[in-house]
A protein has these predicted regions:
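Anionic-ligand binding patches
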Residues: 2-5, 12-19, 23-210
Length: 210
């Protein structure tokens, strides 16, 4: 079985692609599985740039193919200077705690939303490095609401879920059940296809000395 390193320490994030890649005989490893301890300065201006920075840094430390991803958040009707972009947790140079994030974004919804609701969209950037070749991919997920009224439940790692509402179900993400997830699960097989096809392409190029 082939191994592919995901440049993240977040196991829950890795689960998004684990099953699909296993079907292609590829096992996903995270930074918890490999003896690499480096600091990476993510100073790119886009999600793709940051993903490339992370992938390049870890590719130098291992012989494994490496992929990394980053995301940006766009909020409708919010001024450009207040758009979170890549810095969802960092506001005015300060890294926010979970509680501060909930307060800050719920206040944005109150100020710029309609009836306390702002429409948001996550846009993702991914980079893979294999056999010295670089590949990039971007996609977005379905719109959702950020509300000025928080749920009473806070998710570790994902504090924005406390003030985020799935439009299809009209439920807070923190209150969505396993049954609900089956109804709203977005097909990310195209991301798995990108990873598999990129690895396959890099092997072909290596074989042909490209």
């Amino acid at each position: 079985m082939k191994e592919l390193l995901f440049a993240t320490g977040n196991k829950s994030k890795a689960k998004r692609f684990t099953k699909g890649l296993l079907e292609h005989d590829i096992k996903v490893l995270t930074l918890e599985d490999v003896p690499i301890n480096i600091e990476v300065e993510e100073n790119g201006t886009t999600a793709i740039e940051n993903a490339l920075i992370k992938a390049r840094a870890y590719a130098k430390e291992t012989n494994l193919p490496v992929f990394a991803m980053d995301d940006t958040l766009y909020l409708e009707n919010v001024p450009e200077d207040k758009q979170p972009g890549m810095y969802v947790r960092r506001v005015n140079g300060k890294r926010l705690t979970d509680e501060e994030m909930i307060e800050y974004y719920s206040n944005l919804a109150k100020e710029y939303g309609t009836n306390g609701l702002i429409t948001g969209r996550w846009i993702y950037g991914m980079a893979l490095i294999s056999n010295g070749h670089e590949y990039t991919y971007t996609w977005s997920k379905e719109n959702f609401y950020i509300t000025s009224t928080p749920s009473k439940i806070i998710n570790p790692w994902y504090p924005l879920n406390t003030i985020s509402i799935n439009i299809k179900l009209n439920k807070y993400f923190t209150e969505i059940t396993e049954e609900d997830k089956l109804l709203i699960q977005e097909d990310e097989s195209h991301v798995v296809d990108f990873l598999v096809n990129s690895i396959t392409d890099s092997k072909a190029k290596k074989k042909n000395n490209f």
